Amino acid sequence: MLSDNNHTPVYLSITTVLFRSDIAQIQRFRDCLLESIHQLRSKRLVARVSLAVVDNAASLDGDRHSHIFTRLQGIDALRFIQPEENLGYGRAHNLCLNQGSDFHLILNPDVYLAPDALVTGIDYLRNHPDTGMVTPYGVNDQGKPLFLSKRYPTVLDFLLRGFAPAWLRNMFSGRLARYEMHDEYLSDSPCKTVEIASGCCMLLKTDLLQKLGGFSKDYFLYFEDFDLSVRLRKYALIAFVPDMKIIHDGGHAARKGWWHIRQFSKSGRLFFSRHGWKWL
């Protein structure tokens, strides 16, 4: 529900990073994003919206996606960036940090925003000065909750969630429920005790993101969102806002093959080494 306030319309910047992304998936992403922006404009919440699309596979595959983002109604400025190499997730997003925006949306191309998602998220950030980032309520395409907000993990949580078979995860279901904040995630009220936010959809105050320098360049893939969350919480809160809804058609590194498992493990070790090991 939009608050009754007289805030000046804001500038929203948005970035998404592609890597051999499915065409139909990107088209759905685009259409949902444009509808959510339309809702913002209909309520006169934004004065300007910019979108930057970074195609990390352009150096390998050529230009396969730029045509999807031409003539977008509601977008004031569009940049389609094709790096000469695959920069990884965080570094690619950091190419677009120098924005003069009020709020910045980091969004995966496999995330589909609800029509009122941006209205809800921006309204929350404007009315909560102590909050630097909001994270949404997410489900998969079958409507199953994804628990995108988390508490700081232990190594055991990390191993169970990333690599354990279903029968073993079931044995530790209570433990994983605490890590995934089921108690807060299934409530109807916003929660400001989030310690880790998923990088698939992050809505932040731009000045704070710039102060942090964006994502750490030390993570090529995975855990850059964990690292950013920990650093951000030194300055502001992260809020889970259940009325800000998305569908996320992705994740599950352990199901994507050995290269992804190695990247996941490498980044996990870096994260714990940098921010503290909690074993159990």
Positions of PLM-derived features:
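Short, flexible, basic/aromatic active-site loop/helix in glycosyltransferases
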Residues: 153-194
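Active-site-adjacent helix/loop segment of glycosyltransferases
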Residues: 226-280
